[in-house]
Amino acid sequence: MKNRFLILLSFVLIVGRDVVCANTSMVRERININRDWRYQIDDPDGVGAALHYSRLKPYLLPCANDFIIFGKRYQRPEGNPGENIAYVKSDFDDSEWRHLNLPHDWAIEGPFNIDYNGSTGKLPYWGIRWYRKTLELSQDDAGKQIYLDIDGAMSYVSVWCNGQYVGGWPYGYASFRLDLTPYIKAGQKNVLAIRLDNPDDTSRWYPGSGIYRNVWLVKTSPVHVEQWGTFVRNQQVDSEIAVMEMGVNIENHAGKDVQVKLQTSVRPVGEEVTQSNTKDIAIKKDSWSSARFQFKVDKPKLWDIDTPNCYVAVSRVFMDGKEMDSYETPFGIRTIEFTHNQGFMLNGQKVAIKGVCMHHDLGALGAAFNEVAAERQLRIMKEMG
């Protein structure tokens, strides 16, 4: 059982990671930018309330528009908050700041103080911190969409690029994406400045601090598969055949209406393509379109907790015969149901679900994500049943 679990764990931590990083083509890159950041404690003198959340909130809310399907969408106000603050400017000399790599949790560094309030580890998780990094883009990146993906930062994050306020995210337990395209310059050095403001007395447990998970720079063509823009779900599964439905959302930032061809192929991980599907899609300017289709898998290899068989769907977008994007969606084929007398059933077999109360931090290592430590946590939970 333990050996089988190690196989599953290896797939999640190694193959799964490679699948994410392999969402690339000639026009899509997902680059880890964890290395070589500069770090500073507190705001410079004179900032006062200029960067208080109450003032930045109207600029942060539009960053959530992609998640709002129905209801109000927020409009960003005019202006450039913080433009006169030294730390956001491209020519600011940060050479005296501390040099570090992400992920980073400043609170775990201490000092420990038994008199701190609450059950938060008695560690100084609150306060204001700044991170800065220089990025150099090639001239080949001109005309591309450039995104910043932050997997986790605690909390009330604000981001500037080349002195311009891009946006941010208030909530510390969610990943988020910002569009750097209007602010970044191809063929030049670009400076990111990121400010975190972690309030005191806002948590009943140890929340961690800092940019505590990975940070990515994503480059795509103007016409590309939307972030998290695919799904695969079962319609029929038995030992002989699996009938699956897939959806793919494609965004158009090309400045005009476009006609694209979407080609999606399906294969078991590490094996040859078993089938493919092609659709023609019209997408309005500054909009998106969705394609849905069925595919069948003969004699499917089912996913379960001991034999985590997986497949991958590769969606390629073509316009005028040129490949614009390639996006991989890993998935497993399985059936799940709840019954009144057996409880949870996976592929027709009873599986006991046991829960634990586990926060996102890694004990004495703090909240900064560590792959080996997370693997250890999974091993322990698996051994618990």
Regions found by a protein language model. Give the residues of each.
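Short beta-strand edge segments in extracellular beta-sheet folds
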Residues: 218, 282, 330-334
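Bacterial Sec-dependent N-terminal signal peptides
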Residues: 1-25
